[in-house]
């Protein structure tokens, strides 16, 4: 008897226009965001699992894809999905060998019920060449707020971390999507609180802030965002 394998992924709606597929650990695959527009669908990251690739291929409207950065869990499904347009950073372009490089901010004006959409470069310690996407009150940052990993150490460059904090403070949004984080969507102020707490550990004369399993520790993530989780469950 043939065994049928379902390739259906759970799609979570944030509002009438924005939805996403959760990240997975096995295989490691990023959260993937879908944003409906009048004449197209924007897709933020394409993930690395078959279920996500299947859902992307179920979109028959024009697809505009933005890659947050070059890591495989965010870009792997490029090889098995189609798209009308692909937007990447200069660094990501070197790895995926395709796409339009985003040097200046891309702005798609508001149109009726569809809010303004922006794609822009965002500073990051985790990976060079990160792109962010904003639609209305939501900003999606991929892994941009995470640290660089060196063995068991998680390291932030002090100067880049300060740039990250400044950029987030200037964002006109209420929520931020952080790929792989518990719950995915967090209040802007909670993300700022966490990053500022990390910045508070800087030491005079040192350009790096280093932790053993800090930002990726589930207990830390749960502690920082437990209020968000409780409110969303009510």
Predicted feature descriptions by range:
Residues 48-113:
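Active-site HxH/HxHxD metal-binding segment of metal-dependent hydrolases
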């Amino acid at each position: 008897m043939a065994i049928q394998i379902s390739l259906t992924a759970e799609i979570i709606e944030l509002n009438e226009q924005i939805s996403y597929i959760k990240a997975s650990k096995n295989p490691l695959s990023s959260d993937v965001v879908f944003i409906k527009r009048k004449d197209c669908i924007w897709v933020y990251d394409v993930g690395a699992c078959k279920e996500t690739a299947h859902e992307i291929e179920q979109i028959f409207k024009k697809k505009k894809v933005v890659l947050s950065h070059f890591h495989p869990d965010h870009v792997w499904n490029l090889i098995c999905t189609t798209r009308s347009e692909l937007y990447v950073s200069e660094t990501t372009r070197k790895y995926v060998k395709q796409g339009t490089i985003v040097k200046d901010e891309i702005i798609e004006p508001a149109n009726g019920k569809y809010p303004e959409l922006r794609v822009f470069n965002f500073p990051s310690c985790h990976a060079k060449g990160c792109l962010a996407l904003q639609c209305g009150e939501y900003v999606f940052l991929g892994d941009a707020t995470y640290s660089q990993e060196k063995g068991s150490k998680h390291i932030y460059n002090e100067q880049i971390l300060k740039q990250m904090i400044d950029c987030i403070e200037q964002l006109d949004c209420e929520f931020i999507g952080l790929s792989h984080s518990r719950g995915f969507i967090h209040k802007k102020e909670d993300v700022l609180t966490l990053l500022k707490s990390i910045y508070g550990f800087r030491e005079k004369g040192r350009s790096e802030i280093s932790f053993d399993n800090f930002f990726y520790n589930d207990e830390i993530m749960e502690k920082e965002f437990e209020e968000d989780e409780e409110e969303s469950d009510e």
